[in-house]
Amino acid sequence: MEPFKVHILGCGSALPTLRHNPSSQVVEIREKQFMIDCGEGTQTQMRRSRVGFNKVMAIFISHIHGDHCFGLIGMLSSFGLLGRTMPLSIYGPKELGPILDTLLTTFCNDFDYEIKFHAVDTTRQEVVYEDRSLTVETIPLKHRLPCAGYLFREKPTLPHIRLSLIHISEPTRRYAIS
């Protein structure tokens, strides 16, 4: 299996302080990055942690309390200013959709990348993202607002057989089945 890294950029603080930042984590797997929540100060923490901006494939927002999403519009704006062209998917509670539309229309309407919002059902567990190497599914959470956690599962890979390590002592025949 490939390395599966989690960068904790912020946790445990509703307000940014000198020692703590609001919620944001980046899961890194197979040269791709996925952000969970984007609290205020996330960009600064990404730079401190040497987490690159150009590999973020998707952003998953758990709920729309400010400490989990106030850094989002700044992040999206920075992606545009840095010349991003790759589409970006944002997953979050349906209540985030209208807020995101207003912010994007006001601040980010002339960037060269597409932003796709995917409303997640915070009341049931479901796969919301899937590619060749992993799936991401929601986990309903109890909170004052609609809220979901995100479970990242790496898909199993087939073992790689190195022909140079296989020693066959007798001649073999090849059979074709039609």
Predicted regions and their residues:
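Hydrophobic packing residues within well-ordered alpha-helices of enzyme cores
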Residues: M46, L72, L100-L103, I177-S178
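Alpha/beta-hydrolase-fold enzymes
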Residues: L158-S164
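Active-site metal-binding motif and surrounding structural segment of the metallo-beta-lactamase
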Residues: E40-Y91, A119-D121
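Metallo-beta-lactamase
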Residues: P93-C147, K155-L158
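Generic preference for hydrophobic
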Residues: V6-I8, I90, F117, V136-T138, ...
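Alpha-helix N-cap/helix-start and coil->helix boundary motif
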Residues: Q43, F53, G66, L96-G97, ...
